[in-house]
Design a protein with these regions (language model features):
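N-terminal non-catalytic regions of secreted/periplasmic and cell-surface proteins
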Residues: 2-43, 96-116
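Extracytoplasmic/surface-exposed domains of secreted proteins
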Residues: 27-51, 61-94
């Protein structure tokens, strides 16, 4: 089914949330470490997140980590993340893709007719 978490093998790069895990937080920091990658252009690093498309992820050149925090809760599970970066030596784009799940949230309804 489209909801299975094992559509993609875990990428070689360290990612968070970890590939094919389920998190409770609906606004998790989403990140990838590119510390082990050969030379790449930090201006040519992109992150796409399902339901959001291309996102404004921040790259930390010291830690070599690309990170993004969702501006609104992630509601569709699983979440697919795709990161692309330009390998300068090979002059090729490289891609890491992974998925993680969001645990079903308990909905807290406040009835409209309650007099406060």
């Amino acid at each position: 089914s489209g909801n299975s978490l094992n559509s993609y093998p875990a990428p070689a790069q360290p990612v968070y949330p970890a590939a094919n895990t389920v998190v409770k937080n609906q606004n998790p920091d989403i990140s990838i470490s590119l510390a082990r990658e050969p030379a790449f252009d930090p201006k040519q690093v992109e992150m796409r997140v399902s339901g959001f498309g291309l996102v404004n992820a921040q790259y930390d050149p010291k830690e070599k980590i690309l990170k993004w925090t969702p501006s609104r809760p992630l509601r569709l599970s699983p979440v697919t993340v795709q990161v692309r970066w330009k390998n300068l030596a090979a002059n090729l784009w490289q891609t890491a893709t992974w998925q993680f799940g969001i645990a079903e949230q308990e909905m807290h309804f406040i009835p409209q007719n309650v007099v406060k």
